[in-house]
């Protein structure tokens, strides 16, 4: 199996997974042309489109792809008006490319957000990013916390295939909270180098995210003051505070 990331709109990722038979699955197609060009170059035949949620930067290529390739579209109920032909829900299993893709419901960024998991890949849309997480446009902080906790239950070698290249910004925020954390500062240097050479930081291994992502694994970090006191409350309360701080963070 081969995984390709297609960068669009400066920081969006479209994911394309294909096998030796040149059949492929397209995840969150935010546009058509880039995908068409890759498929033509590699002689790939799309057999399915996966949608994680309904935002335009993840669905704008769907109708053109359906028309050109006559491809079925799997997605949550919220994506029906954007071309979904097969609605998915928690626990559904999709058998394609001789693999099983399991559906996870991940409310938070949107209420109907889902992810698709087939080891080692987890296509999580805008729920989890490297060193960060998505904004709460529809769901609550509690919703998002438990969605991320669900992702954190996966094996450490899981590869997080997120929808945006926000790693450096996320690390800058994390370092503002933990300025003396050497793991964060060292990884930031690596990310800066990747950014300089226009290389992606994704997919990212879950075991790495457990070291650098304060939203995924807050109890792995030494909080002080008000944040430390929040550790004594329900688990999601600290997550909400961090998300609020991130919303107001100036890069």
Curated annotation (Swiss-Prot):
Positions annotated to bind Zn(2+) 1: 53, 55, 109, 126
The record's free-text note on cofactor binding: Binds 2 Zn(2+) ions per subunit.
Protein name: Hydroxyacylglutathione hydrolase
Organism: Wigglesworthia glossinidia brevipalpis
Catalysis performed (reactions): an S-(2-hydroxyacyl)glutathione + H2O = a 2-hydroxy carboxylate + glutathione + H(+)
Parts of the chain that traverse the membrane: none
EC number, as in UniProt: 3.1.2.6
Keywords of the record: Hydrolase, Metal-binding, Zinc
Subunit: Monomer.
A GO molecular-function annotation: metal ion binding
Its job: Thiolesterase that catalyzes the hydrolysis of S-D-lactoyl-glutathione to form glutathione and D-lactic acid.
GO terms for biological process, alphabetical: methylglyoxal catabolic process to D-lactate via S-lactoyl-glutathione
Entry annotated with the keyword Metal-binding: yes
Pfam families: HAGH_C, Lactamase_B
Family named by the database record: Belongs to the metallo-beta-lactamase superfamily. Glyoxalase II family.
Binding residues annotated for Zn(2+) 2, in chain numbering: 57-58, 126, 164
Pathways per UniProt: Secondary metabolite metabolism; methylglyoxal degradation; (R)-lactate from methylglyoxal: step 2/2
Cofactor(s), by name: Zn(2+)
């Amino acid at each position: 199996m081969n995984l390709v990331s297609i960068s669009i709109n400066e920081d969006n990722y479209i994911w394309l997974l294909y096998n030796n038979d040149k059949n492929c699955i397209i995840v969150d197609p935010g546009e058509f042309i880039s995908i068409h060009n890759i498929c033509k170059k590699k002689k790939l035949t799309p057999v399915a489109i996966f949608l994680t949620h309904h935002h335009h930067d993840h669905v704008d290529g769907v109708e053109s792809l359906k028309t050109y390739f006559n491809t079925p579209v799997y997605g949550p109920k919220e994506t029906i008006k954007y071309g979904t032909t097969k609605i998915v829900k928690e626990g559904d299993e999709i058998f394609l490319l001789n693999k099983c893709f399991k559906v996870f419901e991940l409310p938070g960024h949107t209420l109907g957000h889902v992810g698709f998991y087939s080891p080692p890949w987890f296509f999580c849309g805008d729920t989890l990013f490297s060193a960060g997480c998505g904004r709460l446009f529809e769901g609550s902080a509690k919703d998002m916390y438990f969605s991320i906790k669900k992702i954190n239950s996966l094996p450490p070698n899981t590869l997080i295939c997120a929808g945006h290249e926000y790693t450096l910004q996320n690390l800058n925020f994390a370092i503002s909270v933990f300025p003396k954390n050497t793991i964060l500062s060292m990884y930031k240097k690596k990310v800066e180098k990747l950014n300089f050479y226009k290389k992606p930081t994704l997919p990212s291994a879950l075991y790495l995210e457990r070291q650098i992502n304060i939203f995924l694994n807050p109890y792995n970090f030494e909080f002080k003051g008000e944040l430390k006191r929040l550790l004594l409350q329900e688990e999601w309360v600290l997550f909400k505070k961090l998300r609020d701080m991130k919303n107001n963070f100036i890069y």
